[in-house]
Amino acid sequence: FLSSADVPKPKDVLGHEIGEDYFLASYEEAIKYLKVLDESTDRMVLLNMGKSTLGKDMLYAVVSSEDNIKKIERYKEIARRLSLCEVSPEEAKKLAREGKAIVYIDGGLHATECAPAQHNIELVYQLVSSEDPEISSIRENVITLVVFPNPDGMTMVSDWYRRNLGTPYEVSPLPWLYHKYVGHDNNRDSFMANTVEIQNLSKLIHHEWFPQILVNHHQTAPFPARIWIPPNSEPTNPNVHPLIVRWQNLIGSRMGAEFDKEGKDGAISRVHFDTWYPGYVTQVVDSHNIISILTETALYRYATPHFYTLRDFPEEYRDLTISAFYPSPWKGGWWRLRDAVEYVLTASRAVLKTARDHKEELLLNIYKMGRDVIERFKKEPPYGWIVPEEQRDYPTAILMLQRLNLLGVKIYRANEPFVSDGIKYPAGTFIIPTSQPYGLYVKNILEVQKYPDLRKYPSLWQGIVEPKKFEGAPLRSYDVTGWTLSYNMGVKAIPANTPLKVNMSPVKEVSLKPGKVSGTGSFYILNHSVNNSFKAMNRILSKGGEVLWTKKEIQLNGKKYPEGTILVPVSSVKRNLIEDMAKELSLNIETTKEKVNGNSTIKIKKARIGIYQSWMANIDEGWTRWVLEQFEFPYESIHDSDIRAGSLNDRFDIIIIPSQEPRSIIEGHKLGTMPPEFVGGIGEIGVLNLKDFVEKGGKLLAIGDSCDFAIDILKLPVVNVLKDVKPDDFYCSGSILRVECDTSNPIAYGMERESSSFFEYSPAFTVIPSYGKEGSAKSVVKYPEDSILMSGYIHGEKMLFNKSALVEAECGKGKAILYGLSVIHRGQTHQTFKLFFNSLYLY
C-alpha cells in the first residue's frame, strides 16, 4: 500500500517494526503510537470506553474518511435506529443509503495470542496513511473501530516475554492469569458480563455504535493450518437469523480468496470452532443480528520464530492433500510473528472490503433481521419471559435483568395486573418480550438448551458423498452445552406460551428497590436465601458484630422461619449500619423482641481464608477470587512455598483448593521449563502439611478436579465414581442438572431442597460407611434417581443417579468439603453460591 509521507510509521515511534522477531509492543506502547497518529491525521479519533480491571484507560481507534469523522454522531444514530428497528421500511432504505457500514475489529482478548493485538497497531496505520484506492474507498464507506479488549493482559505478556528474552525460559508460559481474575475465560463471559472489560465492550457495541459486523481475532489455528476462518463447524446455535450464517460464510469465503490471491497458504474452515455457546465475544452478538467473524491464526510462542517441517505435522496432513475447506495446504517452513500479523491484516482487510462493497445491504440487513424477529414472535411462542418481583432472591433477579439490559435487551414492567397462561401476575411484574429486535438473544439465554447429539446427524458435519453414522463416544462440544440463565442464577422466569396481553411500560434503568429495617427488638432477622445477606454478614462480622444461624425451623413474631435463618443481636451492631446495608443491598430486615434459645442457634465467626494459587495459572482459582471479592469475603492467596513451609493452622482456618488436576498441584511446572521460582508444586512435604492442617482442625474446601486430590491425601471414605470412566459410558461437558439438598446441614442453609446445579466434567461421589479414626463422611447435595438433565446434554446419566455432588467429610479434628458440582462456574451460578459461602465461616 502507498503511504502518506507525513504520517509517522510505528517504527518511528516504537523503534521496532510491528511483528519484528523478539519484539512485542505493550498496550502502553500501542497507545503511545496511536496518540501520535491521532495528532497527525483527521482520519481517526482515539476514544475511551472505560477502565480495565487494573485501571488502564481502554482506548480504541475510530478510522474513516475526514468527512465521515466529522459526521460520526450522525452515522452512529443511523446505525442505532436501523439496529433497533425504530423506522419504517421506507425510512430504513433512505438511512441505509446515507449511512456507513460500521465494523468492529478487536485483537488481543487472549493476550498470549499476540499477533492480533500487534496487528491492531499496523491496521490503524495502514487505514489512516494509505492512498491506495482500495483503502481510500474503505475509508469512504466504512467506519472501522479497532479495539484492544484486554489491555492488562497485553502488557502482562509483553513484560513477561521481555523478562525472559534470551534466556532458557524465553517461550515459557505465564505463571499467572493474563487477566487478573479470569484469564482465557474472558472469552466465555460475554452474556454474563462479569468482567469490566466485557461490560465496557457491551456498552460500546449494544448502546453506542451498533456495528453490522464484529471481528474477533485469535491465534490458535488447528495445526498445521496457518489461519482458521469461517464457515464454522457444527453444531450451529438455532437462535440466529439465517442471514447471519450466510454472511459469515460469504465473508469467510472472501477471506479465503484474499489469502490465496496473496499467496498465503494454509487457510482452513469448518473444523474445530462451533457457534453453540453464546459466551464468546463473537456468538453473543449473532443473536443481536450482528455478523460475527472469528479468526484463529497460527501461533508458535510470543515473538520467537520457529521452523516447521512435514515431520512436525499430524500424519493426515503430511501428504498435503487438499480439501474443499483447506484447498491450499501450508507446506511448512519458518513461522514468525510478522507472518501471523500479515495473515490477520489480510483477514481484516477482507472484511473491510466486503463491508465497503455491500455497505447499503449490510445496513438494510440488520434492519430486516430485527424486523423479522419482531414479527416472528408476534405470531409464535415463546412470546417472552415473565419475571415476578416476588423472588427467593430478589437482588439476584434484578442482577439478571440488569445484565440482559446491558446486552441491549428491552425490559418492561406491567402497569396493572394481568394473566398469562392462566397465571395471575400483579402490577410491577417484569416482562421481557421476544418481539423485539434482540428477541432471539432473549430466547437464546433464557430457554432450555437441547444440545444435538451429533452422532445422529452425520450430514451436518461430514462433508462426504455418503455420510456415515458414528458409533463411538459422543462427539465433544467445544464448550458447555447448557446455560439457561434463570436456572443458573436461581431466578423465577416463566416463558409466555400465549400472546402477552398486558399494559406495560419500558424500564429505562433496572435498579434495586431500597430495602428497609422494620420495627425494634433484640434481634435483626435476615433471609439466608438472599445472596446479598452474605455481604451483610461479612460487614457485620468485620465491625465486631455477632451473627447466629438457627439450627431448625423457628417461630418468631407469629411467623415460621426456616432453618438457617440469620439472627443478629441488636446490641452487637449499630442500627445505622444495618439500615444502610438494608437500603444498599435491598434487604428487608425484620426485628423480633422474642428471646431465642442459645441451643437452637449456631454462632458463626469470621474465618482466616487462604486460596491456593498455583503457578499453573488456574482459571478456576481466578474466578474463586472474583466471587469472594464480590461478596466481601476477606482472603489471602497462598502459593506452593507457603504450603511447603507448613504451620498452616497458625495462618488459616480454611484453605480452598480450586479445581486443578491433582498431579499438577503436587508437581507444578517441570524443572527447566520456567524460571526457578515458579518450578514445582507443593511437593510431598506440602501434601503432608495440608493433611496436618486438616487433622489439627482446619477446613479444606476442594472444588472439581481437586476433589480427587483431597480424597487421596486425606484418605477420605469417599469414591469418585467418574474418575476413570470413559466418554463411551459417561459424558457431560457443561450442563445444568437437578440436585437435592440436605437443608438441615449448615452448608445448605438458604437452599431449596430441590435445586439446579452446574456440571462440567465434574466428579460425583459415593460415601463409604466409615467407623475408623479417619472419621465419617455425609452427602450434603446429591443427584436424584431420575430426570437429572435440566438444560444441555448428558450421556450416561444413570451413572449419576443417587450419587453425591457435595460431600462433607471429617478428618481428625478438621474436615474436608468436596464440591463435585461447579459451584461458582464462571461467576454465573448464583443459585449455588450459598453452598460455597456457607462453608467460609467458622461454626
Each PLM stretch: what is its role?
Residues 1-114, 118-142, 182, 188-189, ...:
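Intrinsic-disorder/low-complexity accessory segments
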Residues 124-127, 131, 139-163:
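Carboxylate/His-rich catalytic cores and anion/metal-binding grooves
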Residues 146-150, 161, 216-224, 706-707:
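Short, solvent-exposed turn/loop segments enriched in Gly/Ser/Thr/Pro and often Arg
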Residues 152-153, 221-223, 301, 663:
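Feature marks short, surface-exposed loop/turn motifs that line or immediately flank catalytic pockets
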Residues 154-179, 183, 199, 203, ...:
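Active-site-proximal cap/loop segments of hydrolase catalytic domains
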